[in-house]
Amino acid sequence: VTITIEGRQVKVRAWRYEIQGLSGHKVPVYFLDTALPENTPWDQTLTDHLYGGDSHYRLCQEVVLGMGGMALISALAPEEPVIYHMNEGHSALLTLSLLESGSQSGGATAPTEAEVEAVRQQCVFTTHTPVPAGHDKFHWDLVSKVLGPERAETGRASEDSSPFG
């Protein structure tokens, strides 16, 4: 899949691993990878390490996980899952992708309360670090730089009734 980071097209591939439970049921787990020759050397490092780098690097990683993960789910499954489960805040930008895809304007205008509520109904969030230090916070100027001003404003417009956790 391809995502946009700072106006650049970043290719993301997935590695599939199946976990088999005691009952024999298999659950696929996908690992996202940006170490592709068509990406810039810096973009290739985004999936090298978890919990590394400065705020800029971390936000770019969260774009890969949240928006890249959503793009992968959309590419693999012709029908959308009913519920999206986000573990910790690292994938929270998935909600912005959901908001854009469910928006009447395609994310070009501020989301309505009904659109924000529809995203809320599709999401489950689990945290294992229920303290402020366990959740990334990014300045709006950095968000605007990484996501682009229009996407950043979509998130800002829904901040008061945010599905973004």
Where are these regions (language model features)?
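Catalytic cores of carbohydrate-active enzymes across secretory and cytosolic contexts
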Residues: 1-165
